[in-house]
Design a protein with these regions (language model features):
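A short, structured surface patch at a secondary-structure boundary
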Residues: 1-57, 61-67, 169
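Extracytoplasmic substrate-binding proteins
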Residues: 71-149, 170-171, 227-287
Length: 287
């Protein structure tokens, strides 16, 4: 839940939380950084919110993503303040704006500035390394529920591909803030050199490598199919950790320019800033 994650990183854990929408996505991280995580109640997700639970928790502020702003009147009718953050059109600016807006409401402006500075540094550091790169790999970022869905240009996955020194192979399809269903014929026509799948996908790398329908694709033939980290929280979503997604993308596409050691230094810096913790490459699922 990228919206709730903004409150987690600005509080350095569960400081501002009385309830969760969905605990599952980043459970491996939240269990370690949010005291009493298991006791925090889930109040529903998406448009299925249990208003009685929200009211009973004595909620002072509800934060919603733009795609669920139609729920605002329900909370206003219950006299609960609502803050709409996280634009549906995803980019690094979306993350900056989300952290800035919520930090103002929580009085965490200085903390937000430090996190945004780290995010900006990842792209800034990548640019000079990529100056002389003439060949940028074509990449397709697949969706989680189906391998026959792709990230279009309006999603933050495209920003990650480009910041890491690649080119999104997807063309001719678009949608705001969601993966687009496509046919295997379309993916074959794009013939990506690299395929990334989310860590939370319902299928595996081997599923693709062993599927004859995919066998003519460059990324499959050269076994350049990778799980986008991390095992404790997604780095490919519009959250503060997307800066680590930039660093991993750069390492994955151009390992000669950006080493695993450099990547892990940035990982340690980020998690120290946000949670005063560090994690090993093994814990993060980074090979």
């Amino acid at each position: 839940n990228p919206t709730l994650n903004a409150a987690v990183v600005l509080g350095g854990g569960g400081k501002y939380l009385v309830g969760f929408g969905n605990k599952s996505m980043s459970r491996a991280l939240y269990e370690q950084v949010i005291e009493g995580f298991e006791e925090l109640p889930e109040v529903g997700k998406g448009s299925n919110i249990n208003m009685e639970s929200v009211i009973a928790l004595g909620t002072d502020l509800v934060i919603l993503p733009e795609r669920h702003q139609d729920l605002v009147p329900q909370f206003e009718a219950a006299n609960i303040p609502v803050l709409v953050i996280l634009d549906s059109t995803e980019s690094f600016d979306t993350v900056r704006q989300t952290l800035t807006l919520l930090s103002t409401a929580l009085g965490e402006e200085a903390r937000a500035e430090k996190i945004i500075t780290f995010l900006d540094a990842q792209s800034d550091n990548a640019e000079p390394l990529l100056e002389d790169v003439t060949e940028k790999p074509s990449v397709v970022f697949l969706g989680s529920s189906s391998a026959l869905s792709v990230a279009p240009g309006s999603m933050i996955q495209t920003s990650l591909i480009e910041a890491g020194g690649g080119v999104n192979a997807v063309s001719g399809v678009d949608g705001v803030g969601k993966f687009i269903d496509v046919s295997i014929e379309q993916i074959i026509s794009w013939n990506p050199e690299v395929i990334w799948i989310p860590q939370y996908a319902d299928y595996t790398i081997d599923d693709l490598l062993n599927d004859p329908a995919w066998s003519s694709i460059s990324a499959i033939q050269n076994k350049r199919v990778y799980v986008f980290p991390s095992s404790i929280e997604p780095w490919d979503q519009p959250t503060a950790a997307v800066g680590l997604g930039v660093a991993w993308a750069l390492h994955n596409l151009h390992p000669d320019l950006y080493t695993k050691e450099a990547l892990m230094q940035n990982v340690d810096e980020f998690y120290t800033i946000v949670y005063d913790k560090t994690f090993t490459a093994e814990q993060l699922g980074i090979e």
